[in-house]
């Protein structure tokens, strides 16, 4: 990561800012880059996605903010992954439409505390050669990620 940032800094020292760009009208490159890296960010998550067994109730609000990992890694073979987690409580109004009652209660949600770029697991296809039975057993190369059309 440090080597990449150094290369970018050297590139800008050699080339300067892109022509036609007035600083202040566009977000500077380093700020764009820093905001895009793999890190924890405040995200909205649906309560029902986090607690799918609670479909008999309505919740207000229907989603909550928690810190989750997100952002780009320097290589497409890597994915921004949570390496640390904790449980956090959020006050929610639970509505029971059958009984026409509601109450405020604390529900627990998983929040990410640390993130890291790690190799993607479960790749669709490893790109290994496969035998093509229609061509008399000849080997054919299957591009990565392509399994059907």
UniProtKB/Swiss-Prot annotation:
Alphabetical keyword list: Disulfide bond, Growth factor, Pyrrolidone carboxylic acid, Secreted, Signal, Toxin
CDD domains: PDGF
GO biological process: induction of positive chemotaxis; positive regulation of angiogenesis; positive regulation of endothelial cell proliferation; positive regulation of mast cell chemotaxis; response to hypoxia; sprouting angiogenesis; vascular endothelial growth factor receptor signaling pathway; vascular endothelial growth factor signaling pathway
Top-level taxon in the UniProt lineage: Eukaryota
UniProt xrefs under PROSITE patterns: PDGF_1, PDGF_2
Role, per record: Snake venom VEGFs that may contribute to venom dispersion and prey subjugation by inducing vascular permeability and hypotension. This protein induces an increase in capillary permeability after intradermal injection, as well as a drastic hypotensive effect after intravenous injection. The hypotension is mediated by nitric oxide (NO), which is produced by VEGF-activated endothelium NO synthase. Also induces angiogenesis in vitro. Like other crotalid VEGFs, this protein interacts with VEGF receptor-1 (FLT1) with a high affinity, whereas it binds to VEGF receptor-2 (KDR) with a low affinity.
Subunit structure: Homodimer; disulfide-linked. Interacts with VEGF receptor-1 (FLT1) with a high affinity, whereas it binds to VEGF receptor-2 (KDR) with a low affinity. Does not bind VEGF receptor-3 (FLT4).
Protein name, UniProt field: Snake venom vascular endothelial growth factor toxin 2
Organism: Sistrurus catenatus edwardsii
């Amino acid at each position: 990561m440090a080597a990449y940032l150094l290369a970018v800094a050297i590139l800008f020292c050699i080339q300067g800012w892109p022509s036609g760009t007035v600083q202040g009208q566009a977000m500077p490159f380093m700020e764009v880059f820093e905001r895009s890296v793999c890190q924890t960010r405040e995200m909205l998550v649906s309560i029902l996605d986090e607690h799918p067994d609670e479909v008999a109730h309505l919740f207000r609000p229907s989603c909550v903010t928690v810190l989750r990992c997100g952002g780009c890694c320097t290589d497409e073979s890597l994915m921004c992954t949570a390496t640390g987690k904790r449980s956090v409580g959020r006050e929610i109004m639970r509505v029971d439409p059958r009984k026409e009652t509601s109450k405020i209660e604390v529900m627990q949600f998983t929040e990410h505390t640390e993130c890291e770029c790690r190799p993607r697991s479960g790749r669709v296809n490893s790109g290994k050669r496969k035998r093509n039975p229609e061509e008399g057993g000849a080997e054919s190369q299957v591009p990565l990620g392509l399994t059907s059309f």
